[in-house]
Amino acid sequence: MDSPSTTASGWIDEHHQGVRYGLQGRVLVDEKSPYQRITVIDSSRYGKGLLLDGCWMTAEHQERHYHESLVHPALCSAAQLERVLVIGGGDGGTARECLRYQDVKHLDMVEIDGRVVELSQKHLPSIGGHAWSDARLQLNLEDGIAWTANATDSSYDVILVDGSDPTGPAEGLFNEAFFKQCRRILRPGGVFATQSESPEAFRQIHIDTVRLIRQVFGYADPLYGWVPMYPSGWWSWTFAAVDGPRYRNPLPARAAAISSGCEIWSPRWQQGAFEAIPAFIERELT
């Protein structure tokens, strides 16, 4: 959809396949960038939030459900953390969680839409937090697909894809050619991760994405959690590696250093989230 609907009673809704997902609030910004429609809202429940092309992306009071789930299984398990690549993530939340690790020496954030970054910094500053002023962060306002294609072999220890749904500028982040480039530029012992849609609202996209990543990397597994403002509230992230499912085993020292500052993630939560694969999806992937 192109823009959220706003009712007379102040509800801002996302519509998906005959179901409405809404928050009560008011629109602060609604504009069109060269890539997508960007809407910033102020809701009574989740604080300020961001929508792209009418689809909920993040909000101040529930963003940790998404960002911690994407980041920590990868960064707690990769062999090294010196160089990290984040594709998308213009709200800054993924970069913020990555930069909590002192072993990260350089983080490339590649975001195609600079207006998302500007509006997030202005209206949602708590999500990016100190990441925007961290000297280790290099913000690149470029196409993430082209960035991976042009990167040198084995140049990143962790690659995180924090993109929107597979339409518009994010469509190319879900195909085989892109995943192969990510594998090429991943260092030995590295971990790749991407958001992989809802197993309920986007069932076939989710299954196809996990299957394709597994074919490209050799090892890949979905992790399941919840993001209350997303379609169905049930979401997934898929993790991959070429040398075994290392993403399932957080390194104790890293986990101990990071978990006390987390709202959602812990080694115990992660174990359950990987094991929570529905039977019908497990059959499809076998």
UniProtKB/Swiss-Prot annotation:
Q: Which residues bind S-methyl-5'-thioadenosine?
A: 36, 111, 143-144, 169
- Single GO molecular function: spermidine synthase activity
Q: Tell me which residues bind spermidine.
A: 67, 91
Q: A GO biological process this protein is involved in? A: spermidine biosynthetic process
Which Enzyme Commission number(s) are on file for it? Answer: 2.5.1.16
The domain of life is Bacteria
What are the UniProt keywords, alphabetically? Cytoplasm, Polyamine biosynthesis, Spermidine biosynthesis, Transferase
One Pfam family name from the record?
A: Spermine_synth
* UniProt-recorded name of the protein: Polyamine aminopropyltransferase
Which organism does this record belong to?
Answer: Prochlorococcus marinus (strain MIT 9303)
